[in-house]
Design a protein with these regions (language model features):
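Charged, gly/pro-rich active-site loop segments
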Residues: 2-13, 95-155
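Short beta-strand segments
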Residues: 39-73
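Low-complexity, charge- and small-residue-enriched intrinsically disordered regions
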Residues: 30-42, 48, 130-131, 148
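Amphipathic alpha-helical interface surfaces
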Residues: 57, 75-78, 110-113
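A short mixed-secondary-structure module that forms the rim of ligand-binding clefts
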Residues: 62-91
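Short conserved beta-strand and strand-loop elements enriched in small hydrophobics
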Residues: 44-45, 86-98
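Extreme N-terminal tail/first-helix region
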Residues: 1-34
Length: 155
């Protein structure tokens, strides 16, 4: 992990421009300067499972009642760190709190979350999952199989 200017840690393979962009997103999200993007982007801080250092990055989220849903293909450091530690610090629209994360493994629940993303905002769905929201069921299930979800609850 490489420390960047705004306190975010990013994998070394991420180029300088991307690191700067992530740092700016964190900076702007923390100040409420991201407009509508703050409706689907949060700031997450995790403790490194190997280094023990804090790592901060913006990620997408969706509210499900009192729970916060995040998604990942499963290969990001923040995702692995949450699974290892079981918790993270989340910042949503200026509110910072500790949250407990749980990997969603139940297939019915995974499909329900995926469908919620698809129907709530098809444009965001298409940007996140890179597939049209009106795709055939078998294509949607193929894409779903590549994604993992973590549900957070405030501690």
């Amino acid at each position: 992990m490489v420390e960047t200017g705004a306190g975010t840690n990013t994998p070394p393979q991420v180029n300088r421009f991307q690191k700067f962009g992530l740092s700016m997103q964190v900076f702007m999200l923390r100040r409420g300067w991201m407009g509508k993007a703050s409706d689907f982007l949060l700031v997450i801080t995790t403790k490194g499972r190997r280094t023990g250092r804090n790592a901060t990055i913006p990620i997408s989220y969706k509210m499900d009642g009192e729970e916060i849903i995040t998604l990942n293909p499963g290969n990001s450091n923040w995702f692995k760190n949450v699974l290892a530690a079981g918790s993270a610090i989340l910042e949503i629209k200026g509110r910072k709190f500790e949250a407990v994360g749980r990997l969603v493994t139940d297939e019915k629940e995974r499909r329900s979350i995926f469908e919620k993303y698809r129907t709530d905002d098809p444009k965001i769905f298409e940007r996140l999952f890179r597939i049209p929201a009106v795709s055939p069921e078998e294509e949607l299930l193929r894409v779903l199989s590549k994604w993992k979800f973590i549900k957070f609850t405030k501690r």
